[in-house]
């Protein structure tokens, strides 16, 4: 999971802190005018709107304009990296995160986002190193724990992953994806009862959460509760039909192997 800096106030404050110091003190980087700042504000609004609408290619174009106008702004670089991750432009995204980290080595978000890109490349050790750095900077970063759990899952370190997911849920009790990930791992390590209990709790609290509906379908089908499994499936695919695609579930959503196998049995009516 990546983290966007979508608060216009935060972006503008970052610009102010940069333009009021380093940029203002060199001939190569003259002070920005009020007109430039207003134009930047307008572009940032467009970038945020495009991001919220899922138009990541357009968002990338806007963030590029901001990077060119405000090259010392780490938030602009990090957000363009996120737009590129969302389009699977992973190497270009990592280059952007590297630049953001160079500009702001004590900022947590670029490390978190670079970790996500590295994880998508299967570079789990490097991703974990970035998540560890986030936790050095902010020991209570729930998303860093969740993401590190994802990377640990990628390495097959299920107990370590479960510890991270639990920690993320402890820090942020409403972090539904961390709880869902923990439930998936419960099933992976043979704790089916705990998996079902957590999935049912999540469905009650978040009835529009397709990942948990699909997971509960797979688990219930495999323990002989076909009727309830079917009802959850109708709800799940009604919200997100990608769960019908085993390859997507395995390689993009990255469910644990036992969960993928359970879903496969359901899809093939075994």
Predicted features, each with a name:
Residues 2-6, 13-70, 270:
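N-terminal leader/linker segments that initiate helical-solenoid repeat arrays
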Residues 25-36, 228-270:
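Terminal, low-structured helical/coil segments at or just beyond the last alpha-helical repeat
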Residues 41-52, 64, 75-86, 95-98, ...:
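Conserved alpha-helical positions within TPR/SEL1-like repeat arrays
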Residues 61, 65-68, 99-102, 133-136, ...:
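Conserved structural position within tetratricopeptide repeats
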Residues 204, 210, 214-244:
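TPR/TPR-like (Sel1-like) alpha-helical repeat modules
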